[in-house]
Amino acid sequence: MQAAPVSEALVDLADEVLVHTGQHYDEAMSGAHIHATRLPHPRHNLGVGSRPRDEQVALGQERIAEVLEIEQPDVVVVRGDTNATLSGARAAVAARIPLVHVEAGLRSYRDDMPEEHNRIETDRLADLLLAPTPGARTNLINEGVSGRVEVVGDPLCDTLERWRPEIVPAEGEYLLATVHRNYNTDAPERLHAVLECLARSPWRVTFPVHPRTRAALKSWKLAVPGNVDLVDPVPYTRMLELERGAQMIATDSGGVQREAYLWGVPCITLREETEWVDTVAAGWNVLVGVDPDAFAKALEHPRPQERPNIFGDGRAAHRIAQLVVELASSELEAAA
């Protein structure tokens, strides 16, 4: 959804070809989100679907390579840390097309996270690395990446500023929960501990269930606490309403951690680490893993008095668009 402001910023500067890999195979996770956020309709939908990571990355690379052969772009832009990100990065490098990585330099230092491997390899391949925060830039400099590094801010900040006037907080007192990381859903004892955490909430828990999580709950036959309301995945704008209206948010999602911070809603992260360390340093995000006692303690964590501006001024998309066009222009001049 963070592609929307960047696409808007590029409208008058370049011809953008938006590619949707189909990594999120559930309609509520993809098509409905694209519709809700008014993203331009993707010119190519690759239908990669759900499959083991290595297969997903390889198939995504193969199909993106076919798109690159058809479209012949001057620059390839990838964002974030998904398998699709890595597929696009590898395809661009193989085709000798300059690569831009948006959201570069983030590190959780957790080796068993596929997202961490995706980030690191993409950063090593990129020609232009666009870091959302100064800390992310520092990570890249310390790693000695070969590409050019620029701090641009977080496009997610642009997205929320765009939607803020239209997002009415959901009613009622509730804790909002999201869980989808493989290490939280693929081990029954860990997913059970997540449910034990949610059972400690003094409010009812609204839990939009990711397809991976729903399948795991069913597979492991885990009992859902009585205070937890499982609901189907919701469109992005509805998710923002739920976030804005929540008393607190419990999540293992990097995006939701940032959205919680930008809404000013305290967050409990169901991980032992986070790539968004600034939210923890500011006191708005508490890391508890899946320890129910730590979760209960975090529920009592005092709301900070201040919320520093750590994600930029809402103009990240403008900076990204300008830098992408500059890179494309320089490549064309060099080839002339």
Predicted regions and their residues:
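Nucleotide-activated sugar donor-binding and catalytic core shared by glycosyltransferases
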Residues: 1-203, 214-336
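Conserved C-terminal portion of the radical SAM core fold
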Residues: 210
